């Protein structure tokens, strides 16, 4: 936004000036190449994935695409800052190239780095990298699944309509967990009366007891 004040003199010899009311004229925002103003990693106004996708669909050029241009100036990028939760566990690999980086590297090795946030020590931080090890130990300690015996004629699974198929029919799976009846060349398979019941219990109160209903 810009404010324009028009100064109009009363006459040529008079020193009094007349100020007209301020007029606000919206100025068009100027886009700048991102490579010309950004010289650090942090971006204070990072565009969203939706915004980048919209510019890609519109076919914007590089000077209009939000991925390669920005409304921020070089001063905005230089003054932008952020704070970390604490001191990182591992130092950056690029600290040995500059003199400041070498000093920080020596402080890291000597343990003289002070936490950015007071009261947060390195020993108090939760370690999220042990999740995979904890999960593997949990899985190894848990019980193994017992596979069904192939020699038995009928396998009993409580709560599901399970049927036994001969190997010459399917050539692959012997046990089918289809809960709904299927129609094929062998005819319709028998369906238990409580298959569609949500609780899948024999004689449940939420399903009609069909075996007690007379058929005549």
Swiss-Prot record:
One BP term from GO: sexual reproduction
Per the UniProt entry, the signal peptide is none
This protein's source sits in the domain of life called Eukaryota
Keywords from the UniProt entry: Cell projection, Cilium, Cytoplasm, Cytoskeleton, Flagellum
Task: Say if the entry is tagged with keyword Cytoplasm.
Answer: yes
Q: Where in the cell is it found?
A: Cytoplasm, Cytoskeleton, Flagellum axoneme
Which GO cellular component terms, listed alphabetically, does the Swiss-Prot or TrEMBL entry include? Answer: axonemal A tubule inner sheath; sperm flagellum
Fetch the InterPro entries from UniProt: SPMIP8 (IPR034584)
Q: Which function does this protein serve? A: Microtubule inner protein (MIP) part of the dynein-decorated doublet microtubules (DMTs) in flagellum axoneme. May serve to reinforce and thus stabilize the microtubule structure in the sperm flagella.
Subunit-level organization: Microtubule inner protein component of sperm flagellar doublet microtubules.
The name this protein carries in UniProt is Sperm microtubule inner protein 8
Gene designation:
Spmip8
């Amino acid at each position: 936004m810009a404010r324009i004040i028009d100064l109009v003199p009363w006459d040529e010899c008079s020193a009094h000036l007349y100020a007209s009311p301020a007029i606000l004229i919206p100025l068009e925002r100027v886009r700048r190449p991102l490579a010309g103003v950004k010289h650090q990693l942090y971006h204070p106004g990072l565009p969203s994935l939706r915004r980048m996708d919209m510019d890609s669909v519109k076919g914007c050029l590089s000077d209009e695409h939000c991925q390669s241009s920005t409304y921020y100036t070089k001063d905005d990028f230089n003054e932008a800052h952020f704070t970390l939760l604490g001191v990182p566990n591992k130092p950056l690999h690029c600290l040995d190239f500059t003199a400041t980086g070498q000093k920080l590297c020596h402080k890291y090795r000597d343990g003289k780095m002070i936490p950015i946030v007071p009261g947060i020590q390195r020993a108090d931080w939760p370690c999220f990298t042990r999740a995979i090890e904890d999960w593997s130990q949990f899985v190894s300690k848990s019980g193994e699944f017992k596979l069904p015996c192939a020699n038995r004629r009928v396998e009993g699974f409580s709560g599901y309509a399970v049927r036994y198929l001969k190997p010459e029919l399917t050539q692959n799976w012997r046990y089918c967990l289809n809960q709904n009846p299927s129609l094929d060349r062998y005819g319709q398979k028998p369906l238990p009366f409580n298959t569609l019941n949500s609780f899948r219990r024999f004689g449940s109160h939420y399903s009609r007891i069909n075996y007690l209903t007379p058929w005549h």
